Amino acid sequence: MTVKPELNEITPYLQFNRQEWGNFRKDTPLTLTESDLDKLQGQIEIVSLKEVTEIYLPLSRLLSFYVTARQTLQQATYQFLGKPEPKVPYIIGIAGSVAVGKSTTSRVLKALLSRWPDHPNVEVITTDGFLYSNAKLEKQGLMKRKGFPESYDMPSLLRVLNAIKSGQRNVRIPVYSHHYYDIVRGQYEIVDQPDIVILEGLNILQTGVRKTLQQLQVFVSDFFDFSLFVDAQAQVIQKWYIDRVLSFWRTTFKDPHSYFHYLTQMSETEAAAFAKHVWNEINKVNLMENILPYKNRAQLILEKAADHSIQKVYLRKI
């Protein structure tokens, strides 16, 4: 284990390289096969069994300890009260930029955590479902701010998190379609008292100025039991974003019903230039203003290299 405070300053994080972090796997068995892993891959990010073994297995072991400890604490509370209360899920928040690999991280963690005996029921929720509809964003002049904090129906997201954390059953989650680039009206996914909820989103660690004591403001991160930030250099993420757009340009965008079908009328060079423009004018701005400044609020940071491999792990001391 190495602890390397930057600029000789005291840091709340412990820093580990791949080998050091991988040692924390101990005797945790690898429960995923190559076939399982194929189903979890992202559009441009390929996660190897080596990555799972060295990074995600130790992380799932740590999280399993945390979840079990929280369950034990809940049981102590129930024993004190003398009656059982509704099961309260453990909520993990995963934040980071567009195209940094949040969805892949969420899927891999769900697969691993659901194989631990004490918490087999794991659900993933994305904040995409809480974006305002395109019609509303157009009306408010916010289409070019899609993904920024003001483009989300935050009251609805907070109500859903409150319901989940209160142990409510059959909580409805709005469905978002990346194919249509919009909310799917009338469609919902149901979250019914899982053991763990993984919430994935861009701005979920963001806070604002607290209101007066009479009007206390609640933030999304207030509901988290654990938070994780997926990090990489901005220039690296830009390349990943362009690669992702081009991957869709070659495949799903060819569907005439796709929102971005018009991009297929462009050459590959033009499509890449379009993606770079969107990155510079929208996604990079959002990263610098609303995502990156809150990185150090996370309890764990996964730092990626240009090949998508995680090279460093930062774990908050407490």
UniProtKB/Swiss-Prot annotation:
UniProt record, GO biological process: coenzyme A biosynthetic process
Domain of life, source organism: Bacteria
Gene Ontology, cellular component aspect: cytoplasm
InterPro entries to which the protein is assigned, alphabetical: P-loop_NTPase, PanK, PRK/URK
Main location: cytoplasm
Gene Ontology terms for molecular function: ATP binding; pantothenate kinase activity
Keyword Cytoplasm in record: yes
SUPFAM superfamilies to which the protein is assigned, alphabetical: P-loop containing nucleoside triphosphate hydrolases (SSF52540)
Keywords: ATP-binding, Coenzyme A biosynthesis, Cytoplasm, Kinase, Nucleotide-binding, Transferase
Alphabetical list of Pfam families matching this protein: PRK
Record localization: Cytoplasm
Entry-linked CDD domains: PanK
Pathway participation: Cofactor biosynthesis; coenzyme A biosynthesis; CoA from (R)-pantothenate: step 1/5
Family, similarity comment: Belongs to the prokaryotic pantothenate kinase family.
HAMAP family given in the database record: Pantothen_kinase_1
PANTHER family for the chain: URIDINE KINASE
Name of the protein described by the UniProt record: Pantothenate kinase
Organism in which the protein naturally occurs: Coxiella burnetii (strain Dugway 5J108-111)
Gene for this chain: coaA
